[in-house]
């Protein structure tokens, strides 16, 4: 069976067992700030397992795209060198949300694996593990399925503490957890390795192919396990692993899917030996990179984009090791489409953008390598020993993306080594900084534990009443808060909008006869709306009723910006093309920010046309309508859906703007607050456009009175410019143009005069040349000269004094500029960089450079004259 046939067979089998086939979620986790990438089939169902979300099915089956690279799950360095490490893989899974449990889960797995109708694996090739106290699972395997006792292995707490086991799964330190049962396949005694639980278990003979996790308990902070009222099932089987089993190969890289990619890489790079690890790297990384880009990740220097950039560069580096020249990696997309495009049509649909992104990143990496080589060459010329410092290796790696293996290769060519210990020390420091400063946010789920949902009554009202369901202070639930206490309060119903879809949460206040609570923000925790704020008077208690009052002016301004954001999105797609996809947004009361996918900056003319389109819809003053539809009806209506977002079976469809071909100007799914008519927006004005990451642009805009303020400020600035230029309003551009041309001409004259002055000064300085250590040497101080003019003077002197050592110090205000050059015949013993480093160190400044030319600077201080006077003696010794 091919990998594609195995994937389809798995999904069809579980459909036949009453499961709903659910599409793979995006590799960018939706509404889960704790994850870098989707790395398991259960990620998209996390809220279902936590009881925070209910769907119209209780059984599901998926083939989930997963990436493990960066963060907690980082397989990157092993990829290509082992049989089963990948950055991208597919996880086949079946799930039960409080429906069936161990008996059905294990029976399904055994039936699918061994039945001749499905995979037909030999039963004598299969072994299973169970948690050592899970007698229920053991008995199901032994007494009901009929597996011999010597094929069932009990695994205890093999990770150092209670419930820390390969066969016990936990979502976190507290919360859902439970035992699991894994199924292993025996590849045969010709391959080294032992059964699970033996010293040889890390070998490749017995390979785990399926894991059945039983969410049976809730673990509390005291470590006690309490049975869940509705236990659930989460299973996972790696498609690549089961394909290797069915295709009778031991390495995942030998399955049909990878072999097509590896053979294609050989053709693209012109390589004959298909067994090289670098080919496996290119094949694996092509999958993760193409799928990540398709799911909206773009190469950048932070977060997910940084991980993608590292993977691309690692692939390109390995391609270069194989002999690839120019851009080649983007060509791997078409072979990937050949084998995975039917299952994942986003690859074909987004082919042009994926290829363009890869080409751009390859070209950028080529420039980066060139810059890194220059830096490395500079460091090597100043190296005093045989070891390149770890700090230098890390700087090349971290700042320039320079692969450490390339640094090591260059070092070996010069009979040098790299300080691997020092490099690892720097890497660990970076990891520590990342853990401290770059942790993903923790949401309120870890604090707020409320059954049921808050009823939102705020679409058409800014005030209402509600009962206090829960109060939290300092992370703990309390019954009462008093004046000065900061707290989180949950009501049974509220007019306050909770932050979602880019729109900020409402602010305002709660009040009753006993106290006032200032609401500073509103967020969601599952179905609960959490009001964050401070008690400003009196006290509030649980079960009390309060008047909930939203700040109406802030709400109205936010609504204007939210509706304008929808119009902006539609206008962008009209002007730039339908490839434009939202990548992020902020809807506040004073500004709107919209991030979108686009490879090029938006031109001034395009921005004007976008503004014109949006304001035309504002002037039209059409109604903004909402309706609740099932998801299929919403799609049929043409509603925009954000890729990677999770939508329920019933969605809120927002339509606004003029009707063209029976479709509104803008139709999107949205749960936010909006104006009633487009005219309520008043005026729309773009205030900035720029890039925030490769392939991602950002537009910031304002509406209503804020937009009027921007226009009036621009008018005032023009009026001020006219008064300075003594120009009439219709003469502004003409007068500014004339002033620019005049200024440019004056700058040229100044440059010419400075050059004449430098030539004149250079001729005078030649009389100060002296012989130091057998070298013609000029050391002098020049008054009232900036760094650029000092460089010009140096160049003039050097043109007249080629075979010499030149050291110039320029003084301007409280600054010292330094420049030194050494004729090439002297650089074996004396380096310009060393001269500048010596002077800068003595003067408390910085500087450095190449052996023949270096520059630096320092603050002017009382040591200056002494340091310059002592320089000849220093040169005598070097």
From Swiss-Prot:
Its main location: cytoplasm. Consists of three domains; the N-terminal catalytic domain, the editing domain and the C-terminal C-Ala domain. The editing domain removes incorrectly charged amino acids, while the C-Ala domain, along with tRNA(Ala), serves as a bridge to cooperatively bring together the editing and aminoacylation centers thus stimulating deacylation of misacylated tRNAs. It comes from Acinetobacter baylyi (strain ATCC 33305 / BD413 / ADP1). It catalyses: tRNA(Ala) + L-alanine + ATP = L-alanyl-tRNA(Ala) + AMP + diphosphate. GO terms for molecular function: alanine-tRNA ligase activity; aminoacyl-tRNA deacylase activity; ATP binding; tRNA binding; zinc ion binding. Catalyzes the attachment of alanine to tRNA(Ala) in a two-step reaction: alanine is first activated by ATP to form Ala-AMP and then transferred to the acceptor end of tRNA(Ala). Also edits incorrectly charged Ser-tRNA(Ala) and Gly-tRNA(Ala) via its editing domain. The keyword Repeat does not apply. Its EC number is 6.1.1.7. It holds the Pfam family tRNA-synt_2c. It is an enzyme of class 6 (ligase). Its cofactor is Zn(2+). PANTHER family: ALANINE--TRNA LIGASE, CYTOPLASMIC, ALANYL-TRNA SYNTHETASE. It is found in: Cytoplasm. Zn(2+) binds at residues 562, 566, 670, 674. This is Alanine--tRNA ligase.
């Amino acid at each position: 069976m091919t990998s594609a046939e195995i994937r389809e067979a798995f999904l069809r089998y579980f459909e036949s067992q009453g499961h709903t086939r659910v599409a793979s979620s995006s590799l960018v986790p939706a509404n889960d700030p704790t994850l870098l990438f989707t790395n398991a089939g259960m990620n998209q169902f996390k809220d279902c397992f936590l009881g925070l979300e209910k769907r119209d099915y209780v059984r599901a089956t998926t083939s989930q795209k997963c990436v493990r690279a960066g963060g907690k799950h980082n397989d990157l360095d092993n990829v290509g060198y082992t049989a089963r490490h990948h950055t991208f893989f597919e996880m086949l899974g079946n799930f039960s949300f409080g429906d069936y449990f161990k008996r059905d889960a294990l029976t399904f797995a055994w039936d699918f694996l061994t039945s001749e109708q499905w995979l037909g694996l030999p039963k004598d090739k299969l072994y299973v593990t169970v948690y050592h106290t899970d007698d229920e699972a053991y008995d199901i395997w032994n007494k009901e399925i009929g597996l011999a006792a010597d094929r069932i292995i009990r695994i205890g707490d093999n990770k150092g503490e209670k419930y820390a086991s390969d066969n016990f799964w936990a979502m976190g330190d507290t919360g859902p957890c439970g035992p699991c049962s894994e199924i292993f396949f025996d590849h045969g005694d010709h391959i080294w390795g032992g059964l699970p639980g033996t010293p040889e278990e890390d070998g490749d003979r017995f390979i785990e192919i399926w894991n059945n996790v039983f969410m049976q308990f809730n673990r509390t902070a005291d470590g006690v396990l309490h049975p869940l009222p509705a236990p659930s099932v989460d299973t996972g089987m790696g498609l690549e692993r089961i394909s290797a089993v069915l295709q009778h190969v031991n390495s995942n890289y030998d399955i049909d899917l990878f072999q097509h990619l590896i053979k294609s890489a050989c053709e693209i790079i012109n390589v004959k030996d298909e067994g090289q690890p670098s080919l496996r790297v290119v094949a694996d990384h092509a999958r993760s990179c193409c799928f990540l880009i398709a799911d909206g990740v773009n190469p950048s220097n932070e977060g997910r984009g940084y991980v993608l950039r590292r993977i691309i560069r690692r692939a390109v580096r390995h391609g270069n090791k194989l002999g690839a020249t120019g851009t080649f990696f983007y060509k791997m997309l078409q072979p990937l489409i050949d084998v995975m495009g039917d299952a994942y049509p986003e690859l074909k649909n987004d082919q042009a953008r994926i290829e363009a992104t890869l080409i751009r990143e390859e070209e950028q990496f080529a420039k980066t390598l060139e810059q890194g080589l220059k830096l490395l060459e500079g460091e090597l010329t100043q190296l005093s020993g045989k070891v390149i410092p770890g700090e230098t290796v890390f700087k090349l790696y971290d700042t320039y993306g320079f692969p450490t293996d390339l640094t090591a290769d260059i070092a070996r060519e010069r009979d040098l080594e790299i300080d691997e210990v020092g490099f690892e020390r720097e890497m660990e420091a970076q990891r520590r900084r990342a853990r401290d400063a770059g942790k993903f946010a923790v949401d309120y789920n870890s604090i707020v534990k409320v059954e049921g949902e808050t009823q939102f009554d705020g679409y058409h009202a800014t005030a209402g009443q509600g009962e206090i369901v829960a109060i939290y202070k300092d992370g703990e639930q309390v019954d009462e808060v008093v004046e000065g206490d900061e707290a989180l309060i949950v009501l049974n119903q509220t007019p306050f909008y909770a932050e979602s879809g880019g729109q900020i949460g409402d602010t305002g206040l709660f009040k009753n006869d006993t106290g006032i609570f200032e609401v500073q923000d509103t967020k969601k925790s599952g179905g609960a709306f959490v009001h964050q704020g401070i008690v400003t008077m009196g006290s509030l208690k649980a079960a009390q009723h309060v008047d909930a009052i939203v700040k109406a002016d802030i709400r109205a301004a936010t609504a204007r910006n939210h509706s304008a954001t929808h119009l902006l999105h539609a206008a962008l797609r009209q002007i730039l093309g339908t490839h434009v996809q939202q990548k992020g947004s902020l809807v506040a009361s004073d500004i709107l920010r919209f991030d979108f996918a686009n490879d090029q900056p938006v031109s001034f003319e395009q921005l004007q046309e976008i503004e014109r389109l949006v304001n035309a819809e504002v002037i039209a003053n059409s109604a903004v309508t909402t309706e609740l539809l099932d998801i299929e009806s919403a799609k049929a209506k043409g509603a925009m859906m954000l890729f990677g977002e999770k939508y329920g079976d019933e969605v809120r469809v927002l339509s606004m703007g003029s009707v063209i071909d029976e479709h509104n100007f803008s139709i999107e799914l949205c749960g936010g607050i909006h104006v009633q008519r487009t005219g309520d927006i008043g005026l729309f004005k773009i205030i900035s456009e720029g890039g925030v990451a490769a392939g991602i642009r950002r537009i910031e805009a304002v509406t209503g009175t804020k937009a009027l303020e921007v226009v009036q400020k621009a008018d005032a600035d023009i009026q001020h410019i006219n008064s300075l230029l003594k120009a009439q309003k219709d003469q502004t551009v003409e007068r500014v143009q004339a002033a620019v041309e005049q200024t440019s001409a004056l700058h040229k004259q100044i440059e010419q005069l400075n050059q004449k002055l430098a030539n004149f000064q250079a001729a005078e300085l030649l009389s100060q040349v002296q012989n130091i250590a057998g070298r013609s040497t000029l050391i002098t101080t020049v008054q009232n000269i900036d760094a650029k003019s000092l460089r010009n003077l140096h160049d003039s002197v050097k043109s007249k004094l080629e075979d010499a050592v030149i050291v110039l110090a320029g003084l301007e205000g409280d600054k010292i500029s330094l420049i030194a050059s050494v004729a090439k015949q002297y650089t074996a013993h004396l380096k310009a960089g060393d001269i500048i480093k010596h002077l800068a160190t003595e003067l408390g400044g910085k500087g450095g450079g190449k052996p023949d030319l270096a520059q630096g600077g320092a603050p002017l201080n009382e040591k200056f004259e002494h340091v310059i006077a002592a320089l000849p003696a220093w040169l005598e010794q070097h």
